[in-house]
Structure formats: structure tokens, C-alpha cells
Amino acid sequence: MPWKEESEFTKQDKAARVIQQAWKSFLNVAIFQHFKSLIDLRRQGEPRQIVKYINPKEAELLDAAAGIHVRFRLGGVKFPPDIYYKIFTHRPIEDLCANSPRNYAKLPAKHTSHNKNDHLQEEDHSGWYHRIENNGWRPVSDTFWLSTDGMVVEDKKESEFHFSKLKRRQDLEKKRKLRKIEWMRQMYYSGSLEAKSTHHETLGLIHTATKGLIRAFEDGGIDSVMEWEVDEVLNWTNTLNFDEYIASWKEIATSNSSANFKGFRFNQAQKNIYNYGGDISKMQMGIPDDTYYENVYQEPNVTRLTPDSTYGL
């Protein structure tokens, strides 16, 4: 009968949708694991060599004396995600714009600098002790091979760099607290924030404290919530430690420091040759020896993802 055929067709359609959703979920997980493996450095690799493959022009500006390391992350508004990178320095670097009382980009003209009139124009002090930080997260792409003439770079975000170290530290703590609150707020509204206790009264107290903390943040802003309050709620609610989670991701997607790499030394290489003594079989056979170099960067063994990839199926 027609209604039986329609019912069977509906069952087949539902079964096909279940199979399609399961396959799509598996494919998305496999794609994410692939992108995660691309940035799985774990404190390995020479930073300048890594940046050279990403942006050769920027790699020429890197100085090993600055103690540089490169960090990667996944991001973007679509899936598959984009890979972003940022260069960090962990040695003191003096910035002239942040420590000198002058805006060198707006120097007075020569004819006004020698003017001895009584009615001199007051010097504009705007921009003094001011620095703009342009070292943001940028996507890994092949656009550096193309000409940038006539191209508009979108989302070029500039972050301010305060000259006071205390102010920079306070801003960093405020940003870390905001990230924790947003993380807890997102888990709370998605229903993934679970309490560690099974006692009914304790669950009620935890739920009330979490709800009050989020409401105080939404009404009064970030200054109305203390960081220790957020830590207490996170300790009572979720088994996932936020700080350990962030530290783990930073460890995964961070290269080695340029301070750990030294240049090639001819004396050391010559000493290694003398240490062979009478055994020159390796040198005659042309077998490479890693003792000639103090550090050797090995390119990670990765595969390119294509639409035809089936991940072993």
C-alpha cells in the first residue's frame, strides 16, 4: 500500500541521515586531528627555520639574540580551521618609542626648528611614550608570494603597548581573568559545566554561586568579579583544569627557543674529525654523522589533506 511504501522510505531516509551524520562527525574529527598534528611541535624546531617556510621575508628580521620562539594555534570562523602563528620574545628588548619622550614619526620641520619668534607654536605632545604593538596572530598562508599592491589587508588589529611594566602585568592578569570567565560562561550556557559533588544541598550551593558569578559579570563587568572567585567555582564544577588546559595547548604548538640554538663552529667540527682516529670507514662511505652539527632541524613527517583522503578506510 502507498502508506507502507512511504513509511519504509522514511525509515530508509532516517537511516541514511544517521549514516551521513556519523561519517561527517568522523571526518571532522579526523580533519581536526590532522590540523592538530601539523602544529604538534612540543618545544622542537629552530624558530627561524620554521618561519622561513611560512614567511621568508619575516624570517630575515629574526634575531637569535632576542630569544625567539614561535607559537601556533587553530582559529577562524569556519571549519576546517585556519592555522595562526605569532612570534614571541623572552629576552628584554628596548623599544625607543616606549621609552623616549618624543614622537619620531612627527618631527618638526627644519624651518620651524630654527624660528626664534616669541610666538612659537606649542609642541604637540600626543604620541609621546606611546607604542603600537603590531605583532599579532596572523594566518599561515601563501599570500607572501603574491604582490600586495592594490590589496586590502582585512582585520589588521593593533594592540597598545604601555610603557609601564606594572600596567602591562595588570592588563595581562585582567585578560587572563576575562578568558576564564568567558570559558566558564560558555560551558554554563551550553550545559557542559558539571559539579564534582553528588550531594543535593551542595549542588544547589554550587549552582547558585555559579549563576550569581555569571550574573555579576554580565551586569557589572569584569571588575565586579575577583579572579579567586572564578577559580573557586571552576574547582568545584569541572574536572578540567583551565590553567593546565591552556598550558598543554601552549606546549603542543610552541617551537623551541632560538636561545637554545648555536651556530656552526668550525673548531668543534674539526675536533670531531680528529676523534675518529684511524676509523675513517664512515667518512669514506659517505655516511652522514650528526656530531658535525650541534642542532639539526628535521622537517615533520606530515601528509597533505585532500578531498580524496579517506584516513585508512
From Swiss-Prot:
Per the record, the major location class is cytoplasm
**Compartments, as annotated in UniProt:** Cytoplasm, Cytosol; Mitochondrion outer membrane
Q: In which tissues is it expressed?
A: Enriched in the pancreatic beta cell and the testis and is expressed at low levels in other tissues tested.
A GO BP annotation: negative regulation of protein targeting to mitochondrion
Which keywords does the record carry? Answer: Cytoplasm, Membrane, Mitochondrion, Mitochondrion outer membrane
Domain of life from the UniProt record? Eukaryota
Give GO cellular component annotations, separated by semicolons.
cytosol; mitochondrial outer membrane
Instruction: Tell me the function of this protein.
Output: Acts as an inhibitor of mitochondrial fission. Interacts with MFF and prevents DNM1L recruitment to mitochondria, promoting a more fused mitochondrial network.
Q: Which PANTHER family match?
A: NADH DEHYDROGENASE (UBIQUINONE) 1 BETA SUBCOMPLEX, 4 (PTHR33504), PROTEIN MFI (PTHR33504:SF2)
The annotated subunit structure for this chain is: Can homodimerize. Interacts with MFF; the interaction inhibits MFF interaction with DNM1L.
Q: What is this protein called?
A: Protein MFI
- Which gene is annotated as encoding this protein in its UniProt record? MFI
